[in-house]
A protein has these predicted regions:
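A short beta-strand motif characteristic of beta-propeller blades
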Residues: 35-39, 74-79, 114-119, 154-159, ...
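General secondary-structure propensity
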Residues: 2-4, 258, 313, 317
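Short, positively charged, low-complexity/disordered linker segments
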Residues: 34-36, 292-316
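Blade/loop signatures of beta-propeller domains
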Residues: 2-35
Length: 347
């Protein structure tokens, strides 16, 4: 896993790393004092920002991947994908990768925006690409899950599942895990794409799994959060919430944090699924949380920082009802995007 060290300016993929654990190791304990800059893009943002060095990368329904200088809030460059983009980009070394509604997945030079390679799926790619072991993994609404070579974009394998895939995968050396609209969670062999196991839930699985230790964690629209054995998919535990879950889990301090459309953020013991606490955020919680050192941050009608042990609100930045993405925390700044197309830098 490529978790950023404290104080570093790297948050290179959805939920921070290829295992999608949402763990930062930073403590954003202070209430942000104000907005350092904000910019409005031409259309809505339905993805999460990622951070690499001094550039913040944001995809948008205007069809562009935007690279924003974090010091000034001005564009460093932007790339026209030719179709709206729901996919959160992923940084791998000098590359940045993303999918789009036209079905293409592209790798660009992250400093310049120059295209390195492009590959086409048969339908939109809303999932964020995940990089592991020199391969790029992603699912598509065409019902296929793809693995391509990181350096060239050449196809490695395709697994056909005949159901739309909007879940972003998590990947480890032992497996690639993702949800599917056929109500199942899958584990594929990274080298071949062979289905190692699949586990049925009661409804669509658009949540992105997180892999930690001997557990894969994921939510389902059947109202439940699941902890599965990564080797065979057997259920360690299942926790029922009041409505469907499209939020992805985050893991830290032996707890898993996950939001539900029943307006609550839940803290559960990773080993047992026992409820530690829940807090009512007064709105449907579809954004994934992120975990700092003793702090959980989540966007829901603004951004909340909660005490990870108790769920008590430490601070809240009220920026409007349109925030349902994933905040990027550096220890000094917080970067946020909203469905109205506004990007915020708080300090």
């Amino acid at each position: 896993m490529n978790q950023p060290a404290s104080g570093s300016a790297e948050w290179g993929s959805l939920l921070g790393d290829s295992a999608r654990t949402g763990g930062l190791g930073l403590k954003p304990a202070r209430d942000p004092k104000g907005i350092r800059w904000r910019i409005r893009l031409a259309k809505s943002v339905r993805s999460a920002p990622v951070l690499g060095g001094d550039l913040l990368y944001v995809t948008c329904l205007d069809g562009y991947l935007h690279a924003i200088d974090t010091k000034t809030g001005r564009h460093a460059w932007k790339f026209n994908a030719g179709a709206p983009i729901h996919s959160t980009p992923s940084i791998s070394g000098a590359k940045i990768l993303f999918g789009c509604d036209g079905g293409q997945v592209r790798a660009l030079e992250r400093d310049s925006g120059r295209k390195i390679w492009e590959i086409a799926a048969g339908a939109e790619v809303w999932a964020s690409p995940v990089v592991q072991g020199g391969k790029v993994f992603f699912g598509s609404a065409d019902g296929n899950f793809y693995a391509v070579d990181l350096e060239t974009g050449a196809g490695e394998w395709v697994q056909t599942l005949m159901a739309r895939i909007y879940s972003t995968a998590c990947a480890t050396a032992g497996g690639v895990y993702f949800g599917c609209s056929d109500n199942r969670i899958y584990c594929l062999e990274p080298s071949s794409g062979k289905v190692v196991w699949s586990k049925a839930s009661g409804s669509v699985v658009d949540s992105s799994p997180a892999a930690t230790g001997d557990t894969v964690l994921v939510g389902s629209e059947d109202f439940a959060a699941y902890a599965l054995d990564p080797a065979n998919g057997s259920v360690h535990w299942k926790f029922e919430t009041g409505l469907g879950i499209s939020s992805s889990p985050a893991v830290g301090g032996g707890m898993v944090f996950i939001g539900s459309k029943d307006h609550h953020l839940y803290a559960l013991d990773v080993r047992t699924g026992k409820l530690g606490w829940k807090v009512n955020l007064q709105t449907s919680v579809t954004a994934p949380p992120v975990v700092g050192e003793g702090v959980v941050c989540i966007q829901a009608d603004g951004v909340f920082a909660l005490d990870a042990a108790t769920g008590k609100v430490i601070w809240r930045a009220a920026l409007g009802r349109s925030l349902q993405s994933v905040p990027v925390l550096t220890g000094r700044e917080i970067y946020l995007t909203g469905i109205e197309g506004i990007i915020y830098a708080l300090e």
